[in-house]
Amino acid sequence: MDGILKAVREKIEIEKQLQHQLETCSADICAAMFEEFAPFPHNSNGQLCWPAHWDADVGDLRKHLLRFFEYDDCFSGCRAQRMWPLYLEAAFPFMRGMPLIDMLTSLVVRTWHHRSCGKAWLQSVEFFCGKANLSLAALEAGLKAAAMDKTLNPEHNVLEAPGLRLALLLLTATVPGALEWLGSPCNSYVVLCRAQSLRSADNMYLGDESKYFVLEGNCLGDISALLVLLGVMTLLRF
């Protein structure tokens, strides 16, 4: 076979293999596949626990969370503090009634726990991935990747409890320094949509929430911010 044709055929075969890998780590995944990352480290009384030598790190984490709450108070009308508990209670019903700072602490400590015992393995996670081109590039680079988008699988819809649970499980399965990428839908935020969304500084750009697409955009923004904050907080250790 001619040299160039052979090279092309090999390239096509490699692309087929990568595409299969991509489907396996994107469209085919669901929350049930990551349940090994669901448990939270707890003691015999069911209380969240961690090694004594983590005490300073957990204290530092909670200080950072309190500073974030101050920012939320000043610039977002306490949006995160009002909305995030609703989302987290949907994903983890046992959290119902917990203070938000304890919910967030639990999620971060759980990630630290899985990293410390060697269970974490994801090096790249792409949320709202669309066609997952970034994850395809990650696989091509030899990284262990996962991607989710409701266009690939209805179970990836983060506005439903299983989808949000999956997103948080994926975050928990990441190694230190993993890439966390969000392609959050922004159609209701663009200038061309302003006449319909009615987003402005006067309403903190929340717009007319009586319209479904605006409310959906706001909720997706809330969840995106939650994932970003958790991703940053997990870097306080390791």
Residue ranges of model-derived segments:
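Short Cys/His-based metal-binding microdomains
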Residues: 1, 6
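Conserved active-site and SAM-binding loop architecture
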Residues: 8, 12-238
